[in-house]
């Protein structure tokens, strides 16, 4: 199945000049969603994760059901102030300004094998920050996984871990 056929392209979103690859149409098609999750499971399984870390917010949509399918745990990497209790965070640079990812203290034990999951790999900034945060708490980051990669942006080069993707947009 060609998953690109189920991903809607929206020009000029979220700002002029950007072509947004919207996975909501893929999620809405039961067959395409099943195929996507099966393919992701096959790609992630080989990294033998103990736990999957989903990046806010579309990463949650993938990581939670994928963790169930693989029989491993799931944790959330969220933006500043969204998690209850004590958190550990990491600030990272954006094109204009900074952002922050946080994880609940104790959510991952030092040495646990983690695969970080998001919907899309573009410049690699968010995934790289998530990987750095996971390393900061002592996790063994085995890989990253996404549905979409915008390979022309070379984000994979920033990750320093294997990256599993299903659909590549080269321009």
Curated annotation (Swiss-Prot):
Signal peptide: none annotated. Pfam families: Pribosyltran. GO terms for cellular component: cytoplasm. It catalyses: AMP + diphosphate = 5-phospho-alpha-D-ribose 1-diphosphate + adenine. Its EC number is 2.4.2.7. Pathway: Purine metabolism; AMP biosynthesis via salvage pathway; AMP from adenine: step 1/1. GO terms for biological process: adenine salvage; AMP salvage; purine ribonucleoside salvage. CDD domains: PRTases_typeI. PROSITE patterns: PUR_PYR_PR_TRANSFER (PS00103). Its main location: cytoplasm. InterPro entries: Ade_phspho_trans (IPR005764), PRibTrfase_dom (IPR000836), PRTase-like (IPR029057), UPRTase/APRTase (IPR050054). It is an enzyme of class 2 (transferase). SUPFAM superfamilies: PRTase-like. It is found in: Cytoplasm. One of its GO terms (molecular function) is AMP binding. Keywords: Cytoplasm, Glycosyltransferase, Purine salvage, Transferase. Belongs to the purine/pyrimidine phosphoribosyltransferase family. Homodimer. Catalyzes a salvage reaction resulting in the formation of AMP, that is energically less costly than de novo synthesis. HAMAP family: Aden_phosphoribosyltr. This is Adenine phosphoribosyltransferase. It comes from Granulibacter bethesdensis (strain ATCC BAA-1260 / CGDNIH1).
């Amino acid at each position: 199945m060609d998953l690109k056929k189920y991903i809607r392209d929206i020009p000029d979103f979220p700002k002029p000049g950007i072509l947004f690859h919207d996975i909501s149409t893929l999620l809405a098609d039961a067959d395409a969603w099943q195929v996507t999750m099966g393919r992701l499971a096959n790609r992630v399984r080989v990294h033998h994760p103990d736990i999957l870390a989903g990046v806010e917010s579309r990463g949650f949509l993938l990581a939670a059901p994928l963790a169930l399918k693989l029989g491993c745990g799931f944790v959330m990497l969220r933006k500043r102030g969204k998690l209850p209790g004590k958190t550990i965070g990491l600030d990272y640079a954006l094109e204009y300004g900074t952002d922050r990812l946080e994880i609940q203290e104790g959510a991952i034990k030092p040495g646990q094998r983690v695969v970080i999951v998001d919907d899309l790999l573009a410049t690699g900034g968010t995934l790289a920050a998530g990987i750095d945060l996971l390393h900061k708490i002592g996790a063994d980051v085995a890989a990253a996984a996404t549905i979409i990669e915008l390979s022309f942006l070379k984000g994979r080069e920033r990750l320093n871990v294997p990256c599993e993707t299903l659909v590549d947009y080269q321009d």
